[in-house]
From Swiss-Prot:
Functional description taken from the UniProt entry: This protein binds to the 23S rRNA, and is important in its secondary structure. It is located near the subunit interface in the base of the L7/L12 stalk, and near the tRNA binding site of the peptidyltransferase center.
Domain of life: Bacteria
BP terms from Gene Ontology: cytoplasmic translation
Record-linked SUPFAM superfamilies: Ribosomal protein L6 (SSF56053)
A cellular component term, taken from the record's GO annotations: cytosolic large ribosomal subunit
One of the Pfam families matching this protein, by short name: Ribosomal_L6
Family: Belongs to the universal ribosomal protein uL6 family.
Keyword presence, Secreted: no
Gene symbol of the encoding locus: rplF
Molecular function GO labels: rRNA binding; structural constituent of ribosome
Protein name stated in the entry: Large ribosomal subunit protein uL6
Amino acid sequence: MSRIGKKPIPVPRGVEVTIAEGNVVTVKGPKGTLIQRLPPEMIITHENGVITVARLSDQKQHRALHGLTRSLIANMVTGVTEGYQRVLEITGIGYRAVREGKNLILQVGFSHPIRVTPPEGITFEVMERRSANEPQQVIIRGIDKQKVGEEAAKLRALRPPEPYKGYGIKYREERVRRKAGKAGKAR
């Protein structure tokens, strides 16, 4: 039995969960609404403020989907109550981010600035640098964990951190393994 799949999901006050035909789960909360179609092989029940997930059989695929389904529902409940965020750090001489309306303008060493338009349900926040040596932070917020992570990965992919000076865009919690530069010529 899946250890994660067995755990019941408590539904906090102010969150409304509906399970429609075909395992279409709708979660409404203070921050918004999320709708997700989940695998039909799972049995999802909502009783007494608790959601439980069970599987039809003990097949390998059903065992794999059991924990996944439970995690997806738990992420939806967390998303509509607390929301999700990823923090990116921009490091480099002349590298900066500016918010223009909803859009994000990045100057990260290309000959032109890069304009990033957020998808539906995602917001960007740009923190100003406190000192010249500190990296600039961009916060990506939203209620859908997958969209927040995907948008953060797309921004990081524009200029991944390089190992020699550490310039580029990285996640706040990411550690960049630094390399030594060229060794001097021996005489």
